[in-house]
A protein has these predicted regions:
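Solvent-exposed, non-transmembrane regions of membrane-associated and secreted proteins
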Residues: 4-7, 14-205
């Protein structure tokens, strides 16, 4: 397990009024159960890979993250990022999974922050670092908030500074500690950019 890293948890300006209302608990329950099965399938597949194959996946991801550093404004110019979809594409676009013990959350992480990815779990924002850690990386992960039929990041506002969460990619598990909770506008990228020498993750709703 790697040492605790700093992270930024950003709560966007998505309305959270629905958080206080009752959800169709049965639908949410079964969706959460499906996520557990998906994660179990991913873990089983990952365990079947040789050490050499795992190292190859992670080396490609590290190289991708290094290439991001040379691109000017990759967040506002994602089409300039090449090789994204083919990197860390282990199982049907799933690159790993996120676990937040303090809110009992465990969700698969998929490429792109598209509606399809968010429906299935957590989406990774193209133009940000892949979530495999390392110096000068900043991965941004997003999910739905307040959906009636799935948990997503509905309880993200319950996180507090000092809480920890983990990201598992293949056989590699990274542990992060919450050090900031902010509200940002959708077009504000300053808090999502790479900070030299830091290993950051933003959870965005």
């Amino acid at each position: 397990m790697r040492r605790l890293k700093k992270s930024v948890v950003v709560s966007g300006l998505v309305a959270v009024i629905a958080v206080c209302f009752g959800y169709p608990a049965i639908s949410s329950y079964f969706n959460d159960k499906d996520n557990v099965k998906v994660i179990q399938g991913y873990s089983t597949e990952a365990k079947g890979y040789s050490e050499e194959v795992v190292d190859q996946f992670l080396s490609e991801a590290d190289a991708y993250n290094q290439n991001l550093l040379a691109i000017k404004n990759p967040l506002s110019n994602p089409e300039s990022v090449t090789g994204y979809e083919d990197t860390l594409n282990v199982q049907s676009g799933m690159m790993g999974y996120l676990e937040i013990p303090s809110i009992d959350l465990k969700l698969p992480i998929y490429h792109f922050s598209s509606s399809d990815s968010l429906e299935r779990g957590v989406g990774h924002m193209v133009g940000t670092s892949l979530p495999c850690g390392g110096e000068s990386t900043h991965a941004v992960l997003s999910s739905h908030n307040g959906m009636s039929d799935r948990t997503g990041f509905t309880n993200l506002e319950l996180l507090e500074k000092g809480n920890v969460f983990t990201i598992t990619v293949l056989s590699k598990t990274l542990t992060y500690q919450v050090d900031q909770i902010k509200t940002v506008l959708p077009d504000e990228y300053e808090d999502l950019t790479i900070v030299d020498g830091e290993d950051l993750v933003t959870l965005l709703t």
